[in-house]
């Protein structure tokens, strides 16, 4: 069954609505440049009220491994998502307070060998692929070109746990899952009425669309 992460959570009501609808994980963005930015203090308040079996994920863009470990420990995050090209395999190995997901934002000439090399050097086995945009790390509402995504996911096969992100919504998620068969999918803008404010109807529709898709 395809795993689902609802990202860019800023309000408790949105977090609980996502959980009730069947989300497997929630994402909290700690980048001050994001329109969905949240403080560790506020994230901790929300995470403490989550039901069991929902993984809390921190999105990090410019923090050091030491800062990431401290935030993960403080908030009791289960996953640290490294959403920047600046993070090296050594950085990933230095994060010990949570499981790590490394993000790639591939352009057309992306070499899949980069993923294999990062996995070998870091020891991590989960990678998220998001649409590339130079001025924004995630939550752009833009999708990865279908041919590029297909090339990447086909090459990866069962070597890791690939997660698809980038402009996913109720309308396009079914075809994306059937085509790529990702381990998980991640959406932020696809279930919002404005950045950081989720729409309960869109959340339910997105999760239902994922659950009814088989491959």
UniProtKB/Swiss-Prot annotation:
- InterPro entries named among the record's database cross-references: Aldolase_TIM (IPR013785), PRAI_dom (IPR001240), RibuloseP-bd_barrel (IPR011060), TrpF_fam (IPR044643)
Domain of life of the source: Bacteria
Q: Which reaction does it catalyse?
A: N-(5-phospho-beta-D-ribosyl)anthranilate = 1-(2-carboxyphenylamino)-1-deoxy-D-ribulose 5-phosphate
Q: Give the pathway annotation.
A: Amino-acid biosynthesis; L-tryptophan biosynthesis; L-tryptophan from chorismate: step 3/5
Q: Which SUPFAM superfamilies match?
A: Ribulose-phoshate binding barrel
What's any GO biological process attached to this entry?
L-tryptophan biosynthetic process
Pfam families in UniProt: PRAI
What keywords would UniProt list here?
A: Amino-acid biosynthesis, Aromatic amino acid biosynthesis, Isomerase, Tryptophan biosynthesis
Which CDD domains does the record cross-reference, listed alphabetically? PRAI
Which top EC class applies here?
Answer: isomerase
A molecular-function term among this protein's GO annotations = phosphoribosylanthranilate isomerase activity
The catalytic activity of this protein is classed by the Enzyme Commission as 5.3.1.24
Q: Which family does it belong to?
A: Belongs to the TrpF family.
Q: Which HAMAP family match?
A: PRAI
Q: What is this protein called?
A: N-(5'-phosphoribosyl)anthranilate isomerase
Q: Which organism is it from?
A: Pelodictyon phaeoclathratiforme (strain DSM 5477 / BU-1)
